[in-house]
Amino acid sequence: MADFDYDLFVIGGGSGGTRAARVAAAGGARVALAEEDRYGGTCVIRGCVPKKLMVFASTYSEAFAEARDYGWEVTSGAFQWDGFKTKLEGELDRLEGIYQRLLDNSGVERFSQRAIVTGAHGIELADGTAKTAKTILVATGGHPVVPDMPGAELGITSNEIFHLDELPKKMLIIGGGYIACEFAGIMTGLGVEVCQWYRGAQILRGFDDEARGAIADGMRRRGVDLHTGTNIMELKRAAEHDPDMDSVPIKDRTNYVPPYEGPRGKAGPIWVKSTTGAEMVFDQVLFATGRTPNTDGLGLASAGAEIGRRGEVIVDEYSRTAAPSIYAIGDVTNRIQLTPVAIREGMAFVETVFNDTPTPVDHDLVPSAVFTQPEFGTVGMTEEEARDQEAVEIYATSFRAMRQAFAGKDERVLMKLIVSQATRKVLGCHIVADGAGEMIQLAGIAVKMGATKEDFDRVCAVHPTMSEELVTMKTPVRTA
């Protein structure tokens, strides 16, 4: 039998890789983990956690305004980015330290440097050290995609937005996915004038159409200048833009400025032109145009693993690659890009490889939340997906919640159930409302268990709440 340095070598110190390493080590395996950036990965360092804290911060402007409608005397104030940013960075440092200590206390050997795969059982660290392992687990996550266009280096991505020196007065957000829409709400709430361009007909492609429309309406009501059917065509530093000089060679122009070579987010005012012909100047441009797996230069293909056309590692139901000793979990596989899913994939991997209990990963009926403003919670099929599969009944209601109605605001809540006519099972649940993420976690339990519409109906409503509508909708609004 071959003698390896480790039973398991994990590449990537995010949520999925860390969990797999810790659990395997707790079971007696010799485990090492390499992380080239910061422990905690996208979720803890530049994703879920800092974003949610920014969501919290951004909602206070609305709360202060609403408080006046409830009789409170509120002194006007301004958001202090410097103070918040300092505390945010301290919190991320604290959480990273927890991840490091959890690995250390589990007996996992840590290497704070890049690692690549050199063969079915081989790993090479950035310092040139070679290691071997019986099993290799790739959990390297993903990174933001920036459009391939001149001037793209002037914009920022979700990686940089948490570390801005100061908040911009005006920001353009490019994209219509969940990251773009979440930051549109965040920055608007923090007092930034936000314009959002998305090339598609409606934001949040892939989600329920009715919910998408409700979210877009809510975003516009809260101040986001949202334009669909619009994309960025050109951008440059405002100091370089002079229509009268377009025919003059760049270096001969009177307003010539050397190419920008500094860090993202510090280029100064940016002139942009849209596909609709609009020309505007913004302090910052945020590209939220998708994410791609971190597989470049890892050596996976040479080791026998298959890489897909989007750069993802191709795996089977047990997260095993085409190379039998190499597995992959999390965003690098481009299955479901959610932290809890990566953690479950890591746990299933340990059961399969180290506990001799082959455990396929269950990716069905995963609840999720989009922290837009208004918030969105969803589980199961969209109306469009369900209608293509079978005959369904749609139960939906849109209304003004008590809290906002009293304050005189035209905020709308959407509660929606998709029900199979044949089995009566609830195939999907979609909620657009403040706090929808908290609600959908519980609704997800019912949908996962196969609850029927009649099961929902048998539950007594909690009054007065928004979520009571989920158990009081008696008549379908349409069938299909």
Residue spans for each PLM region:
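Beta1/beta-strand and adjacent pyrophosphate-binding region of the FAD-binding site
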Residues: 2-14, 167-177
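Flexible, glycine-rich terminal cap/loop adjacent to redox cofactors
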Residues: 11-16, 20-38, 42, 49, ...
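Glycine-rich Rossmann-fold phosphate-binding loop(s) that bind the pyrophosphate
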Residues: 12-15, 36-37, 174-177, 207, ...
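Glycine-rich dinucleotide-binding loop and its adjacent helix/turn
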Residues: 48, 140-199, 222-226, 301-303, ...
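Glycine-rich active-site loop/strand segments that organize a redox cofactor
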Residues: 52-87, 359-361
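A Rossmann-like FAD-binding core segment of flavoenzymes
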Residues: 75, 109-112, 116-124, 131, ...
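FAD-site-proximal beta/loop scaffold in flavoenzymes
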Residues: 152-168, 279-355, 457
